[in-house]
Amino acid sequence: RVSFDKHSSELLPKDEKLIHYLAKHKHTSCFEHMGATLKLKVPIFIARQIQRHRTFSYNEISRRYVDSPPEFFWPDKWRKRAENAKQGSSDEEVVETMLRPASDDRWPVQRVADEYIKYVGSLYSDMLEEGIAPELARMILPQNMYTEMYMSGNLRAWSHFLHLRLDGHAQKEVQD
């Protein structure tokens, strides 16, 4: 209870009640003195959305120094584009999506994507085996590759982040 210049080494029920009151009524300055650091494993396209929150500090594992085999993210379903320009996708699934890769044959999008990822993963490995520096070889890796990072921030920033990113309007993959 800083406002009253009171200090305690234990958390009492009245302190818990005060914490809930302060959070509920958006009196958040007291939450800026405590922090948390999490290690996240997310696809690159999600990491870039997360890193737009400038109240956090980030450290990301670098493919410049780490050349372990990459892992890739796939959505549970391919969603349709939203009619509302404010949203990237709707909940409606695209069924039997077809692409025309390099020929007149039409292929299911998942098959094309799977083949592409196999090719890119193999090419990346071959480039490293040929002695190409990881900092150059990494440029061919796609946005759905997983990356790992540490994310640190105070509790007020975490509360704000979760409020925005768990909202139903946020991209599904961010919510997950």
Where are these regions (language model features)?
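Family-specific signature for flavin-dependent thymidylate synthase
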Residues: 1-176
